[in-house]
Regions:
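Short acidic, hydrophobic short linear motifs in intrinsically disordered regions
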Residues: 24-33, 102-114, 134
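Transcription-machinery-associated regions
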Residues: 123-129, 133-139, 146, 153-167
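A short, conserved structural fragment
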Residues: 48-60, 129-139
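Short amphipathic alpha-helical interaction segments
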Residues: 37-45, 113-131, 141-144
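Short amphipathic alpha-helical interface segments
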Residues: 11-21, 85-105, 109
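Short, amphipathic alpha-helical interaction segments positioned at domain boundaries
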Residues: 74-89, 151-167
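Short alpha-helical segments that sit at the start of domains
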Residues: 1-14, 67-93
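Minor-groove-contacting beta-hairpin "wing" of winged helix-turn-helix DNA-binding domains
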Residues: 64-69, 139-150
Length: 167
């Protein structure tokens, strides 16, 4: 009985942590609160709680991040006021797509694919949005920096994993 109460409390804590976060929460961030329980078991309980009769659902992003999102069947009925974001330039979207499909990729490889040089500002804009991040260095002469997408990229574009990209 005590173990069951403890598990219920852990479920509530994990649920609150995910709910209160503005960004997807990683399994690593949740693990200190599990007190010996399995995260998958806790997540399963939360998913059942937010089944089809709820306005929100727990979404798994990538393989180990979680976020609450509006249930798809009512999303169209909601009209939320948001700060208007300036749309990305065509070049920035093109570079983001190249990074998403070819990651990890170096700046020179991006330029080779595009056939034109890449301005530092384009990378800066994608970094500001937290859609890309450095992924390490190639073991080639000059040790160029490689780029890849982030969890926030997946979240913003409604993807669970990179395999969900079209094409």
């Amino acid at each position: 009985m005590i173990e069951n109460d403890k598990k219920k409390n852990i479920v509530r804590v994990i649920e609150a942590l995910i709910f209160a976060s503005t960004k997807p929460v990683s399994a690593k961030e949740l693990s200190p609160y599990l007190e010996g329980f399995e995260l998958n078991d806790i997540i399963e309980i939360i998913e059942k709680r937010y089944s089809s009769d709820s306005g929100v659902q727990l979404q798994k992003i990538s393989s180990d991040h979680f976020a609450f999102r509006t249930h798809p069947d009512i999303a169209a009925r909601l009209n939320l006021e948001r700060a208007v974001e300036r749309p990305l330039s065509r070049v920035a979207m093109e570079v983001l797509a190249i990074i998403a499909y070819h990651q990890p990729i170096t700046r020179s490889e991006i330029e080779e694919i595009r056939g034109i040089s890449l301005s530092r500002g384009t990378i800066d804009i994608l970094l500001e949005h937290d859609w890309i991040k450095p992924r390490g260095r190639r073991r080639t002469p000059g040790r160029p920096l490689t780029w890849g997408t982030t969890i926030n990229f997946l979240d913003y574009f409604g993807l669970s994993e990179l395999d969900d990209l079209p094409g």
